[in-house]
Curated annotation (Swiss-Prot):
<dbReference type="GO" id="GO:0005524">
    <property type="term" value="F:ATP binding"/>
</dbReference>
<dbReference type="Pfam" id="PF01820">
    <property type="entry name" value="Dala_Dala_lig_N"/>
</dbReference>
<keyword id="KW-0464">Manganese</keyword>
<keyword id="KW-0436">Ligase</keyword>
<protein>
    <recommendedName>
        <fullName>D-alanine--D-alanine ligase</fullName>
        <ecNumber>6.3.2.4</ecNumber>
    </recommendedName>
</protein>
<dbReference type="GO" id="GO:0046872">
    <property type="term" value="F:metal ion binding"/>
</dbReference>
<dbReference type="InterPro" id="IPR005905">
    <property type="entry name" value="D_ala_D_ala"/>
</dbReference>
<keyword id="KW-0479">Metal-binding</keyword>
<dbReference type="GO" id="GO:0005829">
    <property type="term" value="C:cytosol"/>
</dbReference>
<keyword id="KW-0133">Cell shape</keyword>
<keyword id="KW-0460">Magnesium</keyword>
<keyword id="KW-0961">Cell wall biogenesis/degradation</keyword>
<dbReference type="GO" id="GO:0008716">
    <property type="term" value="F:D-alanine-D-alanine ligase activity"/>
</dbReference>
<dbReference type="GO" id="GO:0009252">
    <property type="term" value="P:peptidoglycan biosynthetic process"/>
</dbReference>
<feature type="binding site">
    <location>
        <begin position="179"/>
        <end position="234"/>
    </location>
    <ligand>
        <name>ATP</name>
    </ligand>
</feature>
<comment type="similarity">
    <text>Belongs to the D-alanine--D-alanine ligase family.</text>
</comment>
<keyword id="KW-0067">ATP-binding</keyword>
Amino acid sequence: MNSSRTRVAVIFGGRSNEHSVSCVSAGSVLSNLDPDRYDVVPIGITVDGSWVLGSSDPSSLAISGRALPSVDKDGTSVVLSADPTREGEVISFDGSDAGAVLASVDVVFPVLHGAYGEDGTIQGLLELAGVPYVGPGVLASAAGMDKEFTKKLLAAEGLPVGVQVVLRPGIATLTEEQKAELGLPVFVKPARGGSSIGITRVSNWDGLDGAIAHARLHDPKVIVEGAIIGREVECGVLEFPNGDVKASVVAEIRMPDADTDSDAFYDFDTKYLDDVCEFDIPAKLDESVSDQIRELAVRAFKALDCQGLSRVDFFVTADGPVINEINTMPGFTSISMYPKMWNATGIDYRTLISTLVDTAIARGTGLR
């Protein structure tokens, strides 16, 4: 490695049910890290939590047909030192080489989606280690991962959000009063999940308990949301090294079956495997509506005290935009909306990745 260049650890995989999506995102990031500026240390986390030196070959992290990639344990076992005096050392944990320093990294790009990665946990480790990292800090990551607290924080800032009921462990189902408040249809979701995994659209109350049980396979805390009727759009937010925060163009997701299939929604297979959705980037909205969405996206970013990046998802209703969710580490796959929106805004993928890394280094770690 050339010591004059920045060493970037790209961490991917992880213990969440979004393991494979993380791998695919990492493949795209590895393909777009500027080789003239960066040396890369790929670190994969297996589904059971083992850290290994991963492959730097992006093709090994691609979707093949409907087969999803994963991290296996074939690589060298490693740990990232949590001791800040070790300055980002990646240390071998393998056999006779145990204890050997394999690399010292300057910054981490945690391309991790879901639990044990996007929820403040990896961010806490990196804060302890004193290693700068791409994306929001511990608080924003934890709050952004939990749909209950995301909406509570956004609502406290006067931002428009939908109606939700939280079913904590031990609460089996909705009361009749809650059903009346929400109406039908509803969406039943794991409270701390992503990529639409574990989500069910319920059009009849007879299906509610099964949907709750399905969501609880992924999270003991469940959210039941009243359906919002409107166009589904997204907006990317990006922080620059000088601290400026800007919003991308707005993009719209169009489900081709939405008019004929009342149960159609943007689920995991639709996002990553079926290639049936249509996208308008930029969305075909009145300029005033797009400007309002972009303003709300930046306000949501700041309300959660985000840094680096986020993607904010909206429904455009007859009464105006409503924030559905905020994603603090959006997908970076070749079909992901976040890089596509920024490309349409005038920032290509490679420049986007460089901006995120530069912003992370400029921000540093610790209280700030």
